[in-house]
Swiss-Prot record:
Protein name: Large ribosomal subunit protein uL4
A Gene Ontology cellular-component term: ribonucleoprotein complex
GO terms, biological process: translation
InterPro entries: Ribosomal_uL4 (IPR002136), Ribosomal_uL4-like (IPR013005), Ribosomal_uL4_dom_sf (IPR023574)
Source organism: Methylocella silvestris (strain DSM 15510 / CIP 108128 / LMG 27833 / NCIMB 13906 / BL2)
NCBIfam families registered for this protein in UniProt: rplD_bact (TIGR03953)
Protein purpose: One of the primary rRNA binding proteins, this protein initially binds near the 5'-end of the 23S rRNA. It is important during the early stages of 50S assembly. It makes multiple contacts with different domains of the 23S rRNA in the assembled 50S subunit and ribosome. Forms part of the polypeptide exit tunnel.
GO molecular function, one term: rRNA binding
Pfam families linked to this entry: Ribosomal_L4
Record keywords, A-Z: Ribonucleoprotein, Ribosomal protein, RNA-binding, rRNA-binding
Family stated for the protein in its record: Belongs to the universal ribosomal protein uL4 family.
Matches recorded under PANTHER family: 50S RIBOSOMAL PROTEIN L4, LARGE RIBOSOMAL SUBUNIT PROTEIN UL4M
Length: 206
């Protein structure tokens, strides 16, 4: 797949052939969905908690005698059926993370990249750099290029001025290539890759 390379200002800088084994697959939505579920589950805090009957601060004394009252027999007042009692099978503090094989994760990333390429959502830049760490100037450049919602992936390190200028722009995410992930690719309209990012991705999946 051939795609044009541009600069941040929109100037043409040639073209590049994208590897079909990474960017030219027929997207599998099931793999992408599994990966998104894996990512979202892993980032959950899991700090939910309710008190069970053993944790309620209330007497454990038998409410009234077993027989002769005409009422249902009861023991502790901490049981779930009473107001103020413990919650039965309530949430506990835990990790929601689950396993997903490494090969499935790698394949899901390829399919997410292919889906974005198939929809015309990939833009290739020669590099991602800024002369000054000025958000206003960079935001104007993005608006001129029509980038209102984008994930920008650079090489192993993001140029400092560019990272500082872009970090406060809404719906613009900037990551080094090792941070690329399926969820962030899908949640933004455009995926911007630098030449360095493409070289790193092709080396990673070779």
């Amino acid at each position: 797949m051939k795609i044009d390379i541009t600069s941040l200002n929109g100037d043409s800088a040639g073209s590049i052939d994208l590897d079909d084994s990474i960017f030219g697959l027929e997207p599998r939505q099931d793999l992408i969905a599994r990966m998104v579920r894996y990512q979202l589950a892993k980032r959950r805090a899991g700090t939910h908690k309710t008190k069970g009957r053993a944790e309620i601060a209330r007497t454990g004394k038998k409410l009234y005698k077993q027989k002769g009252t005409g009422s249902a027999r009861h023991g502790s007042a901490r049981v779930p059926q009473f107001r103020g009692g413990g919650r039965a099978f309530g949430p506990v503090v835990r990790s929601h993370a689950h396993d997903l094989p490494k090969k499935v994760r790698a394949l899901a990333l390829k399919h997410a990249l292919s889906a974005k390429a198939q929809g015309g959502g990939i833009i290739v830049w020669s590099d991602a750099s800024a002369t000054d760490a000025k958000t206003k100037a960079l935001k104007a450049s993005f608006a001129k290029a029509g980038l209102l919602s984008a994930l920008i992936i650079d090489g192993a390190e993001v140029e400092q001025n560019f990272a500082l200028a872009a970090r406060n722009i809404p719906q613009i995410d900037v990551l080094p290539v090792q941070g690329i992930n399926v969820y962030d690719i899908l949640r933004r309209e455009k995926l911007v890759l630098t030449r360095a990012a493409i070289d790193a991705l092709e080396a990673r999946f070779k």
